[in-house]
Amino acid sequence: GLGDVYKRQVLESAITDTLETNYMPYAMSVIVSRAIPEIDGFKPSHRKLLYTMYKMGLLTGGRTKSANIVGQTMRLNPHGDQAIYETMVRLAKGNESLLHPFVDSKGNFGKVYSRDMAYAASRYTEAKLAPICAELFRDLDCDAVDFVDNYDNSMKEPSLLPTTFPNVLVSANQGIAVGMASQICGFNLGEVCDTTIALLKNPDHDVASTLLAPDFPTGGQIICDPAELRELYRTGRGGVKVRSRWRYDKQANLIEIYEIPYSTSIEAILDKVAELIKAGKISEISDMRDETDLSGLKLAIDLKR
């Protein structure tokens, strides 16, 4: 009967064998194909977008509509237009999420420090490659990197970009894969290049003496002991405390915050302060508002007289 059919189809397998044959290949495909940045500092989605823009002549030419770039990128990246456009937004100058943006943008690309400041649709914005991209593609035609087939074998794309500087350390990047996650802070471009040159000249060079601490696109102050920082980078575990930068306007009796930690947003700060005022933990503040405008970020805190 039917019960006998089911009994015959039950296969016994050791969990260790199943993990090795099923889970590990799946985890590796997510790590390699989607989530974790490669040694050039890019995830596949970033690399495909930038290479498409390079092939469109956007390194030397004028800007084109973002929607045009997104459409062309689909030949390399079989994702929806919104996913590709979000990748472009993060790489854009207007969004301010990178120390050295790769996309020279025109129009509203939102802000990394604002949850509510939405970016405009791709049909309204324009973009081209930023000048720094010349260093990403230098010697691309000189057999510097391997080329592989795209998803439908209709064209070739580079497996890596031949960056002339260690971009993986310059561009902040985070990725969540299966069984693995990476969170890489960005560093000052000049310090990274100086450290790289020093290491090439002397393999025993003390990296921490020239690469002092991470740099964040939104600014702020790092509150960390140098010895702790050294240990953090030796082990790869731990975190860095960052606080806002502010100034006091004596005449108006208010505090102006003009730089905030990279991992937070204006709205999250306003919500948290309001929560602390309601809980009675802060009593010196009479009002707090977002005065961010075209000149940059600004949070105003009115103090009680």
Which residue stretches match the model-derived regions?
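Glycine-rich phosphate-binding loop
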Residues: 1
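Catalytic phosphate-handling regions of large nucleic-acid enzymes and associated NTPases
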Residues: 4-236, 298-300
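Charged, surface-exposed alpha-helical interface/stalk elements
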Residues: 207-227, 235-305
